[in-house]
Curated annotation (Swiss-Prot):
Organism: Escherichia coli (strain K12)
This protein's encoding gene: yaaA
Notes on the domains: Has a wedge shape with a highly basic apical cleft (a cantaloupe fold), where DNA might be able to bind.
Protein name: DNA-binding and peroxide stress resistance protein YaaA
Subcellular locations according to the entry: Cytoplasm
One GO cellular component, as annotated: cytosol
């Protein structure tokens, strides 16, 4: 079973590390090509392209400039500990045991605009380059054209290595669009999280993102290997709704807190 999640815009390079083990990203040659393109952008161009403030654009221009191909614990940190968004609040990787990290390293992958695919312990230098950004490059008009089949092929390698054919899609649509489902040697299961609001169940972005992290943690902590085991997920009040679920889509609901 291979879990896919999105990266986060918020990064943490200050907190104490809970493991000293690390690996290196497997697609750095591609990352270096994107950095070459990104370095051509001025801060105002970055601001327009990413729809971010001038201050953030300046920070990210500096990150592109400072990025170097030699990754060490001195200039990078493990991806699963560097990302700090809503998904990672639910995941709480900073509390993982070494055995948890081992399982995650085999069964969890983070999709990334710059790095393509990251394993949890892969070192990562700070960046911001969302998958949906239209950064022109030698391979096309955006990052989807840049990555082509590369991400899908890397995921197929991971599936083959564990002798499995199930992908748990906990990534956002923006990121999963970088995967070619028809070329993926796997059955794709997509958990959906609905929260009650004024008597109706719907996807509420903040809660749904955190729930994706909670589900990832549930799989890792319990060493789950079969998709049917996911129906036991009950973190923070969620429950499986079989009637609303269908082939390939598992629906979890949570009542409004009153």
């Amino acid at each position: 079973m291979l879990i896919l999640i999105s990266p986060a815009k918020t990064l943490d390079y200050q907190s104490p590390l809970t493991t000293t083990r690390y690996t290196l990203p497997e697609l750095l040659d591609n990352s270096q090509q994107l950095i070459h393109e990104a370095r051509k952008l001025t801060p105002p161009q970055i601001s327009t392209l990413m729809r971010i403030s001038d201050k953030l654009a300046g920070i990210n221009a500096a990150r592109f400039h400072d990025w170097q191909p030699d990754f060490t614990p001195a200039n990078a940190r493990q991806a699963i500990l560097a990302f700090k968004g809503d998904v990672y609040t639910g995941l709480q990787a900073e509390t993982f045991s070494e055995d948890d990290f081992d399982f995650a390293q085999q069964h969890l992958r983070m999709l990334s605009g710059l790095y393509g695919v990251l394993r949890p312990l892969d070192l990562m230098q700070p960046y911001r380059l969302e998958m949906g950004i239209r950064l022109e490059n030698a391979r096309g008009k955006d990052l989807y054209q840049f990555w082509g089949d590369i991400i899908t092929n890397k995921l197929n390698e991971a599936l083959a290595a564990q002798g499995d054919n199930v992908v748990i899609n906990l990534a956002s649509d923006e990121y999963f669009k970088s995967v070619k489902p028809k070329k993926l040697n796997a059955e794709i299961i997509k958990p959906v999280f609905l929260d009650e609001k004024n008597g109706k169940f719907k996807i509420i972005s903040f809660y749904a993102k955190k729930a994706r992290g909670l589900m990832s943690r549930f799989i890792i902590e319990n060493r789950l290997t079969k998709p049917e085991q996911l129906t036991g997920f009950n973190s923070e009040g969620y429950f499986f709704d079989e009637d609303s679920s269908s082939n390939g889509e598992l629906v979890f609901k949570r009542y409004e807190q009153r």
